[in-house]
Structure formats: structure tokens, C-alpha cells
Amino acid sequence: SGGFFAAVDLPRQKKQNIEDSVELFYQQTFQFGGGAADPALVRHLVENATEALHWLESLGVRFESDVIGLYGSHWQRVHVPVLPLGTGYIRALSAAALKRGVKICTSADVTDLYFEKGRAAGVVVKIAGKQEIVHASRAVVIASGSFASNNKLVAQHAPHLQGLTTNNIPTTDGELMMAAHRQGVALRDMDAVQCLPGCPPNKKFRVRFHNDVSRHIY
């Protein structure tokens, strides 16, 4: 991910003569999502995005001075991180977590969820070839990505996209999503798979999807 962040930030936007509001953000987000989103969740997103943006900045995440328009937003309220490919978030948030005593495990393969009395209580993880259970203190948050690299799941939940190539990393296989589902966790909107223009299968030419609408057509 490029880490683009959509949020109303009037002081920054007014420098570019951009008019905006939380209500406009809500209406556009709901509209451009085809009306399929949960209105309450969309409202929560747009009303808290500005605070989240400022919180990230307080932790050291840096954004470019100008906001841009981007696919999925259709308005100039998208904040562009200075560091590419999400590295700005990783550096700042990792540093903040370590400062607070959080233990971060890398090169750890989470293979399943661990349940006790019908409740998610941790994860099954393999580190250096050894399998162990990491217990959660309060909750388990699944943030393992999509299933875009799993052709079987794509065919099952979004059959109209079956056979498309992907530029996702192999670990976006939906493994933990399915592990949760086997334990009774409800899944929704599984057919909502984001696609971007790309090269046809078995072709080598590049198709670039530009974000800068001031210099390119998209």
C-alpha cells in the first residue's frame, strides 16, 4: 500500500483553495461505494479521520504539504506520506509501540487462531521452526490482509474476477480470515475486491495507474 490517507483537514486544504466538510466526505464515501457500505461505519470513519491524521503526525508520520485527489476519494482530501509504501507508518508506529513496552515479533508465521471457551484468546504462531501459542491479554485483532492471492477464494466469493492476475504478495491468502470463519466468526462483503488497471495475463508491457491528476489522466 502507498499509505494514502483521506481526511478533512481544512487548514491544509484552504491553502489550496479547497472547500470541504465532514458531511461531504460522508456523502461521497457512501456514494462512491455504491451505497453498499454500512452508513454507521462510514460515519464513524469520516468523523474520526481528522483526529487519526493528527495523531499519526504527533507520532512522527510526515505527510506532504499538499493534498491530492485519488481513486476511491474523488476529492482533494488525500494526504500523501513523505516516505513511500507505508514505511513512514511502520517506522513511527513501531517506535511508539516499543517505547510503550510492546513486544513486536517479526518473521513469525501466524498459522491459526487459538480459542478458549468459544472466545479468541490468542494465535498459533511458528517462530524459527517452533510452534507456540501467543496469548492475548484482551482481544485478537486480525489485520492479515486480504485473500487476493488465493485464486480459490476469489473464485468462490468474486467469481466475476476469477482468473485475473494479482500483484499482491503471496501471504494475502485469507488464511486467518478462514480460520476465524471456521470458529463461527461472520464474514461480510467478501465480493468487494478492489481492482486496478493492469497488464493482461502473460503480457510483459506495463500499465501505470497514475495518482497525480494534475499531470496525468486516470
Question: Which residues fall in each region the model found?
Answer:
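Short low-complexity, flexible loop/linker segments enriched in glycine and/or proline
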Residues: G2-F4, R77-P81, R119-A121, N202-F209
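Glycine-rich loop(s) and the adjacent beta-strand/alpha-helix scaffold that form part
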Residues: H135-P200
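FAD cofactor-binding and catalytic pocket of flavoenzymes
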Residues: K14, C199-Y218
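Short beta-strand segments that buttress and anchor functional surface loops
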Residues: G122-K126
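Conserved N-terminal/central alpha/beta ligand/cofactor-binding core
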Residues: G2-K103, S107-D109, P159, I217-Y218
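A conserved short coil-to-beta-strand element within the FAD-binding core of flavoproteins
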Residues: T106-R119
